[in-house]
Amino acid sequence: MFEGPEVRTLTRQAEQELVGRRITLSSVSPTRPRFLSVSPDPLAFSEQLTGRTIQRITCTGKSLRTHLDTEAILVIGETGGRFQLHAHSDTLPKKIHWQMALDDGRCLTLTIQMWGFLALMTEEELASHPYLGSDGPDPMDPGFSVEMLEEAIRTRQLEKNDPIKAFLIHGPNIAGIGNGYLQDILFRARLSPKRKLADLTDRDVGRLHEAIVETLSGAVQAGGRDTELDLYGEPGSYVPLLDRRQAGAPCPACGEPIQKTQYLGGACYLCPVCQT
């Protein structure tokens, strides 16, 4: 899944490559996976895209937003897979779930792994969307402070005393964090994914803030994780401290074997000694 650092990398590259280009074709595969949501329906989606010019590209959290020369915004969000730019149509991969041709002969393709979201929305529709319009503070922005994190935790704790994993991966709390970067953030903060928000001390929150900033800023500089590809099909250079490749390996801090557990719908990798 693309998380904040991958989306920032794709946004930067797409901004350099696509601004000013006119869309000559959009095609959604009839054999797309059922977990790829397209709005409006695929035919209307492609009809409304064709002929439009790309004006600018931005991102928030885990969604990439292409602003067109109409009021429409093309939103690609909560997506896993490959989003790539090709020199011409002869170089397209065999498996494609959506493609978009440009007036210079190049093509963009999206191939979904797991699930994805494509939508054309106005600013008003985007702002009122129950998920996309409610992202919390972006921890990759320079102004993300420990006070902002404290406020987000305090607000969520009043509504529901979540475990820290549930809090971090919920975009309206903190934008851009998914299960991938969660592992390194919690390891650096020395926190168990099951720790409840109400049990966090001021020192815990301070460590958590440092871990979020260190992990995500490092990943942005590295162009994302080494398991994800950028717009040109190149992997990032951020190597996670903890993922499925480290299960059973010695903890880099204490030597205890890294454990894999299933928690809240996904795998967690942690050191049972360092993370409490």
Regions found by a protein language model. Give the residues of each.
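Basic, nucleic-acid-binding surfaces and adjacent catalytic neighborhoods in DNA/RNA-processing proteins
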Residues: R22-A44, A152-T276
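Generic detection of long, well-ordered alpha-helical segments
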Residues: M1-G4, D90, P139, G143, ...
